[in-house]
Regions:
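Extracellular-loop-to-transmembrane junctions of the mid-late helices
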Residues: 139-178
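Structural signal for membrane-spanning alpha-helices in multi-pass inner-membrane proteins
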Residues: 32, 68-71, 75, 140, ...
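Class A GPCR helix-loop hinge within the 7TM core
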Residues: 96-134
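Seventh transmembrane helix
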Residues: 169, 218-231, 244-286
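Extracellular TM2-ECL1-early TM3 structural module of rhodopsin-like
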Residues: 7-19, 46-105, 113, 159
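Membrane-lumen (extracellular) interface motif
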Residues: 77, 146-159, 233-244
């Protein structure tokens, strides 16, 4: 009886949380998408990757979370409706995997920006980034369709992809940190001879690196609970795991509301554009 009450309370709490977070994800990501479109100082490859991530986060708030709330209500009423669950499964895999892949692609882009340096603009073109982003969405759609088929091995494949991406992204940032430290040691000597434009470009790159690192950290915190509970449930289901599993979904969806806040916090050009947008909407508060 206690376990049943605990599960019921968990479902209700997650209904409330996801109803609220759905609204924040929609509002914040719509503003972010508009701000990204109106920020000319961002390079096209970086803007494309950020837009893709914002669109996937908007999809989480607009489609995934409302459907998840419907699934939770269905569980509370103890009704089994396959149509709702199937819709949730497709949307969840589509947008969450696209968001997950978007963070990885963003990290890879910043790694290439600092690793290739002068060759970055030559090799990482807008067309190539668009091709990568398109491939991510196609792959996400395929995985979503496979999830609908209830293929057992899909959970193992998804867990493997998560592990590889976690490790690779961590290695990327270790390398980025090493390069930044190396550049910092040379900064005093370069400051005398480097042109102002070069110094400004270096500072801008460093700021975007810091911003994407925070995106990665928040992503890690939000996604790890879902990954851990998913792996644990492969070895058997328990009442505690059922409770934790519902909260782990909410943690993943929380990420879609936090990403826009990180952009505004750590990227001054986007923050300024957001301010301009808000001032145009609410002129009295300007």
């Amino acid at each position: 009886m206690t376990e049943a009450k605990g599960l019921h309370s968990t479902l209700v709490v997650n209904c409330v949380l996801n109803s609220f977070l759905s609204s924040t994800a929609i509002l914040l990501n719509i503003i972010t998408i508009q701000a990204l479109r109106k920020t000319p100082s961002l390079s096209k490859p970086l803007k494309t990757l950020l837009l893709s991530l914002a669109v996937s986060d908007l999809g989480v708030g607009f489609l995934v979370q409302p459907t998840y709330v419907a699934v939770l209500v269905m569980k509370i009423k103890q009704n089994a409706e396959n149509t709702i669950f199937n819709a949730f499964s497709i949307q969840n895999f589509l947008f969450v995997f696209a968001s997950f892949s978007g963070v990885f692609a963003l990290t890879a882009d910043r790694f290439l920006a600092i690793h290739l340096h002068l060759r970055y603009q030559e090799l990482v073109t807008h067309k190539r980034v668009v091709a990568v982003v398109s491939s991510v969405w196609v792959l996400s759609a395929l995985i979503a369709l496979l999830a609908l088929k209830r293929i057992q091995v899909l959970g193992f494949i998804f867990a493997t992809i998560h592990i590889v991406c976690y490790i690779t992204t961590g290695l990327f940032y270790c390398k980025i940190y090493a390069v930044i430290r190396h550049h910092a040691k040379q900064m005093n000597a370069l400051q005398q001879s480097a042109q102002n434009e070069d110094m400004a470009n270096a500072a801008r790159l460093r700021k975007t690196l810091v911003a994407t690192f925070y995106v990665y950290l928040v992503f890690l915190v939000c996604y790890l609970p879902r990954f851990c509970t998913g792996v644990a449930r492969m070895h058997g289901e328990t009442p505690l795991l059922s409770l934790l599993s519902e909260f782990s979904y909410t943690c993943v969806y929380l990420n879609s509301s936090l990403n826009p806040l990180i952009y505004c916090w750590k990227m001054r050009n986007i923050r300024q554009t957001v301010k301009n947008i808000l001032q145009s909407i609410f002129p009295c508060g300007a």
